[in-house]
């Protein structure tokens, strides 16, 4: 667990009946995103593990709001991971008296949300103006690449193999 300089809240769901590997697949989609974005992504994710992960994120956001008095608009999913819980072992009967083992895996899902300051949003017009200014300055003085001037780093072109008429004559038969 990492210590943070931002105020945070934690929520855990233990013994969730989903494989940790499948939960991690969903968790990787939302790590580092805002809580609203994360819940929106999980709402439309087709994986079955998205529902319990969304519940834990919503619980962490509620903990942050109710227990710590944090603003829900500034909450970001800072840390989220799925650990392995106990595995229930079951038996599936198979042909000729055999029995195969079924592993019902569980996971412990932990979410830490932090209240981070909102980054200032730039308007589309200011972004266009900034890009236009950057392209003007780049057009005036093109920068030379340092590695392009040295000829020692380039590889010489490969020589093409030339077929001779003797090689093609002896190809078909044996002498």
Curated annotation (Swiss-Prot):
Looking up InterPro entries in the UniProt record yields: Ribosomal_uL22, Ribosomal_uL22_bac/chlpt-type, Ribosomal_uL22_bac/org-type, Ribosomal_uL22_CS, Ribosomal_uL22_sf
Q: What do the Gene Ontology cellular component annotations say?
A: cytosolic large ribosomal subunit
Coiled-coil stretches are: none
Its domain of life? Bacteria
Instruction: Show the SUPFAM superfamilies listed in the entry.
Output: Ribosomal protein L22 (SSF54843)
User: Which terms are listed as keywords in the entry?
Assistant: Ribonucleoprotein, Ribosomal protein, RNA-binding, rRNA-binding
Q: Where is the composition biased (Basic and acidic residues)?
A: 166-175
The record's annotation in Pfam families points to: Ribosomal_L22 (PF00237)
Example of a GO MF term = rRNA binding
Q: For the region Disordered, what residue ranges are annotated? A: 113-175
Q: Name one GO biological process term.
A: translation
Residue ranges annotated as compositionally biased, kind Low complexity, are 136-154
Protein family per UniProt: Belongs to the universal ribosomal protein uL22 family.
UniProt function note: This protein binds specifically to 23S rRNA; its binding is stimulated by other ribosomal proteins, e.g. L4, L17, and L20. It is important during the early stages of 50S assembly. It makes multiple contacts with different domains of the 23S rRNA in the assembled 50S subunit and ribosome.
- Give the NCBIfam families listed for this entry: rplV_bact
Q: How does it assemble?
A: Part of the 50S ribosomal subunit.
List the protein's name: Large ribosomal subunit protein uL22
Q: Which gene encodes it?
A: rplV
């Amino acid at each position: 667990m990492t210590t943070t300089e931002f105020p945070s809240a934690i929520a855990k769901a233990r013994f969730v009946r989903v494989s940790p590997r499948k939960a991690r697949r969903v968790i990787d989609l939302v790590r580092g995103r805002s809580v609203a974005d994360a819940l929106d992504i999980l709402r439309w994710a087709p994986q079955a593990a998205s529902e319990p992960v969304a519940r834990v994120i919503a619980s962490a956001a509620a903990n942050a709001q109710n227990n710590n008095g944090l603003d829900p608009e500034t909450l970001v999913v800072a840390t989220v991971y799925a650990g392995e819980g106990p595995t229930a072992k079951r038996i599936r009967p198979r042909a000729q008296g055999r029995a195969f083992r079924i592993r019902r895996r569980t996971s412990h899902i932990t979410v830490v949300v932090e209240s981070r300051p909102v980054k200032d949003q730039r308007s589309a017009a200011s972004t266009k103006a900034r890009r236009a200014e950057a392209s003007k300055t780049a057009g005036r003085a093109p920068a030379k690449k340092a590695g392009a001037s040295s000829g020692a780093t380039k590889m010489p072109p490969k020589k093409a193999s030339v077929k001779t008429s003797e090689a093609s004559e002896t190809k078909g038969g044996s002498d």
